[in-house]
Amino acid sequence: CWFGMLAVIIGVSLTIPIIGKEMALSAIPVVNGALPATQIMTEAATKAGYPLAAALAAITFAVQKFVGTPFASSASLRYAQGLIGEYRKAKSSGTLDEFMAAAGKSENRNSEAKTASKRITLAEKFDGFYSSNVCILLAVVGGLLSVWLGELTHINYAILGLVLGVIFTQLGVVPKNLLQKAQASGFINMVVFAAIIPALANISISDLIDLILPLVVVFAVSVLSIFVMMKVLPVWKILGDKSMAFGVGFCQMLGFPSTYLISVEVCNAVAEDEDEKAFLMSRVMPRLVVGGMAAMVSILVAGVMAGML
């Protein structure tokens, strides 16, 4: 997914002579994914005096799933059909055990390595202490610390928040999925989404019409850039399949749980029994879901782009 994000950054940057610098910079992190990136760009564009660019960021966020879903679904479907063809061929020839062993060899190695290196963290050891209220308090303290450090270092608070979150989670001081454990992720998403809406308050119907061209250019170039990066260039070899690589490239526009839902629908459409479905889910779902979660890096991209407006 990171290569797909890089493709969008390069491709949309080349459209600056067509749609303008502020439009391109505002749209790139949004296409790269993550609701917080959209909030960062709408806020930065509004403060910089570019209300149309802020509106473009908000509209891009609203539209991107409609653009990314057909490409991710069709590409994943082709990949699943190819896999199930090999699965059925091996089953009919009596070599299914060998086929499954070969297919799961690398996954088993990775799983064993992770199990061997796993350690019990402080958050896991004292899991009972981390109640919803404690987790909310930790999130608030982390947010305040990020804002304070941002004022001190002049680095965007969102970037610092992401870095601090990764550091404290890896150290085991805070539990993984802190907001989910606090049962506050839905509320936080609602608040962040509400912060985007004011970006549309200062534009007229004629302004919305003027945004059609930049919106079309951004998505057309994004699709073309992802195609070149993930299917034409040898990047697809990382995932071992051109169709899957192309589909993963669009996960940045979807995020979780959209990528999970696409995985389930594709596997249900192709599989004829539970064994086939389990096999396909083990191959399709991890690639799409991880690809969608990797788009959280767009917060870093947004922090950089916001400073360039």
Give names to the regions the model predicted.
Residues 1-11, 60, 134-136, 186-190, ...:
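Entry/N-cap segments of selected transmembrane alpha helices
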Residues 1-9, 26-37, 91, 168, ...:
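Small-residue-rich segments of transmembrane alpha-helices in multi-pass membrane proteins
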Residues 2-43, 52-89, 96-98:
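Transmembrane-helix bundle segments that line or gate the permeation/cavity pathway
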Residues 16-52, 63, 71, 241-296:
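Alpha-helical membrane segments and immediately flanking helix-loop junctions
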Residues 21-30, 153-164, 186-191, 212-222:
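Structural signature of hydrophobic alpha-helical transmembrane segments
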Residues 69-73, 168-181, 230-237:
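C-terminal ends of transmembrane helices
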Residues 74-132, 267-285:
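Intrinsically disordered, low-complexity non-transmembrane regions of multi-pass membrane transporters
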Residues 113-186, 199-201:
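Structural signature of multi-pass alpha-helical membrane transport proteins
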